[in-house]
Design a protein with these regions (language model features):
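Short, well-ordered beta-strand segments enriched in hydrophobic/aromatic residues
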Residues: 465, 492-500, 637-645
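A solvent-exposed, charged loop/short amphipathic helix patch at secondary-structure junctions
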Residues: 148, 152-158, 205-237, 318-336, ...
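Active-site-adjacent substrate/metal-binding segments within catalytic domains
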Residues: 26-119
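Aromatic-rich peripheral "rim/lid" segments of glycoside hydrolase catalytic domains that contact
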Residues: 371-379, 389, 400-476, 708-727
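Glycoside hydrolase catalytic-domain groove-lining segments
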Residues: 282-377
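Active-site groove signature of glycoside hydrolases
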Residues: 143-144, 159-233, 254-266
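Surface-exposed, glycine/proline- and aromatic-rich loop segments on solvent-exposed faces
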Residues: 476-597, 659-684
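Aromatic-lined substrate-binding rim segments of carbohydrate-active enzymes
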Residues: 81-161, 242-258, 327, 336
Length: 727
């Protein structure tokens, strides 16, 4: 009996040891060292070819980038369910896409769903799989050859390869940017390639190159499958090593090869520019995959991957003389109706530069109310774009990509992502709470073809003039001829103002709002209005074109953070601090550029956008005249209004958290919590004070509600891609 117990224990230990070494550590024995590798995907010249059973045929990647975030979840929570993925894969395929791209190792849920969708599907989806570089390692004081960075990078490539072949287990918490689970589904037959790395930080590239520029060991790499040329920088040689080890690992262990690419973007593009552009954009680094080659042992090939948007960074929009550029461009072919399409021009320059296929692995335009960059040539801006214009803008981008000679593209992105933040609004919010509300002022959250609208089945209010969704319970104040109602959800505060016999074209409506007890004014000198308590914001409804929301001078968040850039002075210097009860109400703007480049001259004056201007229109997605940017609409005696939380200086509405007084010992943004606001309504200027009523409010913490909705752009892209497939 004793021997039996010992034997059983030994067997258990051996099984556990095998499980640990094989599935957790990737240890294996090659029992077929002489078996030749195969591939079903390869490159030839500037094209990609795929063998789907009838031999190699030219293949255009028509892809969609899928993030890992959901409302109420961080991307690193990997909260998307199997049923979500299966539904999305079906919709993506029906749109006409043939490929999806993910950026990092997801939870096993993704791979199980991908396998189930494809296993009996005669027309499967293909996958481009990314390998993320650890944010902490990459943004710390390390060069690219630091063992913690490059060794982790290479190891993650091998783990990812094991995962797509169904031979890996990962523990929860192994890496903040990585999923976990048991990966036992072999999806490799649908994986066409790997995009390794991230949008490289220029300072890391420069630091690496400068540190090792005189060290021959780091200036060249020659591997069995990949090598760097004599023109390669140390950083490019590092990439060659990573790619070589990834290809070697898959070739030896799984006897197959996929395409390999390295992530890139305009900040590290391979070009040099005139000095005034270099100085303005701080263009200091280049990564050129033409300096990385494949040996004859590579059956698949490699391609150049770029994230390129029409507005960032639009170097060519500022070129005074195109003869100054380091590359040849066909300018005449990029004019349309007398306007130079610099996006197409840049794409052509990229495609012409490379002798290998070019895939634009990210392109897109967001539909958020906020805005971060303006495309001065084609109007494909980063934000403040109606959903109905997103589709045509995406089609224009896609056509530019194909006409430039690229081998494929991936549309960014499939779904909106509430957790995202962007540089020109993140100072105003609690960025540890972004997944728990829909911040329409942050454009980065709204690139998706799939929208997550607040409300379990429908939104609490649509700005469409239909007042049937309002009830007596929503009324917060009432007088002889005026009534004001209010409600809110994860994205907006909604108002319904009713004025008997209201003449929209000739009358005004004023809605004062008091949020903070720390400041505000009982008088607005702009409109000669008086209030019975200190007011922080004033909504003025003045026809279709002149309606706006303004903020009391002391509570202007743009001034508190960008006074020097926008106004040319330090607002925290004594004499510049606005009075606590200043009667001046100012327009609400959002910063776009910290400085400007005009005719080659670098101007220190910042560029701003009037985000407090209210847009008239129908905000119901089911309406024929739908405008997703609409802020208000009038129907007879009724005016419906919706105001984004951020315009009211809420840093986290899920917890009713607003900005504290910027000048009362804080010198910037600090949060305070409230449990109510005060609102009022008036339609005339009189000596009487406008009365404000208290409205009790309650946050929702982490319990968000939402429902999915395909944006119009989905159907626009569907018509383009499906028509192309049928032709």
């Amino acid at each position: 009996m004793k021997k039996f117990i010992i034997a059983v224990c030994c067997i258990v230990v051996c099984v556990l040891l095998f499980d640990y070494l094989y599935y957790y550590q990737g240890v294996y024995i090659d029992f077929s060292p002489n078996k030749k590798p195969i591939t079903f995907v390869c490159t030839k010249g500037e094209k990609i070819y795929l063998d789907e059973g009838n031999g190699f045929e030219e293949f255009e990647i028509k892809g969609v980038d899928i993030g890992s975030g959901m409302p109420g979840e961080w991307s690193t929570d990997f909260g998307i369910t199997k049923s979500d993925y299966l539904r999305w894969f079906k919709q993506i395929k029906e749109m006409g896409a043939n490929t999806v791209r993910i950026y990092t190792i997801n939870n096993d849920v993704f791979y199980n769903a991908f396998y189930e969708f494809n296993k009996d599907n005669p027309d499967p989806l293909y996958l481009l799989h990314g390998v993320w570089v650890n944010d902490y390692l990459y943004n710390s004081a390390r060069d690219a050859y630091d063992p913690e960075l490059i060794d982790t990078f290479i190891n993650d490539c091998k783990i990812m390869i094991d995962i797509v072949h169904g031979n890996r287990k990962l523990q929860l918490g192994r890496d903040a940017s990585s999923g976990h689970g048991t990966y036992n589904k072999d999806i490799s037959q649908w994986v066409i390639g790997y995009i390794l790395g991230v949008e490289w930080e220029d300072v890391t590239v420069v630091y690496t190159n400068e540190k090792f520029k005189n060290n021959e060991k780091y200036n060249a790499y020659k591997g069995k499958y990949m090598y760097s040329t004599q023109d390669a920088t140390p950083f490019e040689a590092m990439l060659a090593r990573v790619g070589d080890e990834a290809i070697e690992y898959e070739t030896k262990r799984y006897k197959t090869q996929k395409l390999v690419a390295f992530s890139n973007w305009p900040i590290t593009d391979p070009f040099t520019y005139p000095q005034y552009i270099t100085d303005y954009f701080d263009k200091c680094a280049s990564v050129d995959v033409e300096h990385i080659g494949c040996t004859d042992k590579v059956l698949s090939g490699h391609f150049a991957s770029y994230h390129i948007y029409p507005y960032y960074r639009d170097y060519l929009a500022f070129v005074k003389d195109f003869n100054e550029l380091s590359f040849d461009v066909d300018i005449e072919s990029c004019y349309k109706d007398g306007t130079l399409n610099t996006y197409k021009l840049y794409l052509k320059a990229i495609a012409d530069h490379h002798a290998i296929p070019v895939v634009i692995s990210e392109f897109g335009v967001p539909t958020g109310r906020g805005i971060a960059h303006i495309d001065t040539n084609t109007g494909r801006n980063q934000g403040h774009m109606p959903e109905t214009e997103q589709g045509p803008a995406l089609v224009a981008c896609y056509n530019d990509i194909i006409e430039a000679g690229c081998a494929g593209s991936c549309l960014f992105s499939w779904q909106d992502e509430w957790f995202k933040r962007t540089w020109n609004t993140n100072y105003a919010i609690d960025f540890m709470r972004t997944p728990y509300w829909s911040d329409v002022q942050t454009n980065e959250q709204y690139f998706g073809l799939l929208s997550f609208d607040p409300g379990k089945e429908k939104t609490v209010c649509y700005i469409d003039g239909d007042v049937s969704e309002w009830s007596e319970d929503d009324i917060v104040m009432k007088s002889d001829d005026l009534t004001l109602s209010m409600k809110y959800d994860e994205a907006y505060v909604y108002f319904l103002a009713k004025k008997d016999n209201f003449d929209f074209n000739n009358e005004k409506l004023y809605i004062p709002i008091d949020t903070t007890p720390k400041s505000g004014s009982s008088y607005c000198e702009n409109n000669d209005l008086r209030f019975d308590r200190a007011v922080d914001f004033l909504i003025t409804i003045n026809g279709r074109k002149n309606s706006k929301i303004q903020v009391q001078e002391r509570y202007e968040v743009l001034r508190a953070n960008y006074a020097k850039e926008v106004y040319g002075f330090d607002t925290y210097v004594k004499g510049n601090i606005p009075m606590r009860d200043s009667p001046k109400f100012v327009d609400i703007n959002i910063i776009l550029q910290m400085s400007q480049l005009v005719d080659g001259n670098h101007l220190t004056e910042a560029e701003v956008f009037p985000t407090g201007v209210l847009t008239y229109g129908n905000g119901n997605p089911d309406a024929k005249n739908y405008n997703s940017l609409s802020d208000f609409i009038c129907n007879g005696d009724y005016v419906e209004i919706r105001i984004p939380w951020q315009l009211l200086n809420f840093s986290d509405p899920s917890r009713l958290q607003i900005h504290d007084d910027y000048y009362d010992g804080h010198y910037g943004i600090e949060p305070i919590n409230i449990d109510s606001i005060y609102v009022g309504v008036s339609n005339e200027v009189t000596d009487q004070r406008i009365h404000l009523e208290q409205v009790e409010m309650k946050g929702w913490e982490n319990k968000v509600t939402y429902h999915e909705r395909l944006k119009p752009a989905y159907y626009v892209m569907q018509s383009i891609w499906r028509e192309k497939d049928e032709s």
